């Protein structure tokens, strides 16, 4: 009987700890920076990384397939992938292919604000929940 109580208490404690875990959306949505560095070549001009063969939608789909973005904005000349603390932009290369650039959320938001509009939260507002533990929450 004593063993049953110990097992029962252990199971209940494990369930309670699991229920108190952090929000997966906040903790597990970092931009796949390491994967991007491994998958694509460093740009020889400008910044970021390049895929000299694939077009914007295919590259954005590859990145999103590796690590799902919180949200995505698509246009003819850019794909923006929103992650917890970063924005990944996929734009065309003049010679064909795509350029991939990773900005922290605030920099990316300011850079792409004309495309983002009011779709994503302004990092200066109280609605923004990025930036890591305890910030903006």
Placement of each model-derived feature along the sequence:
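Bacterial N-terminal signal peptides that target proteins for export
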Residues: 1-8
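Low-complexity, glycine/proline/serine-enriched intrinsically disordered segments
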Residues: 21-137
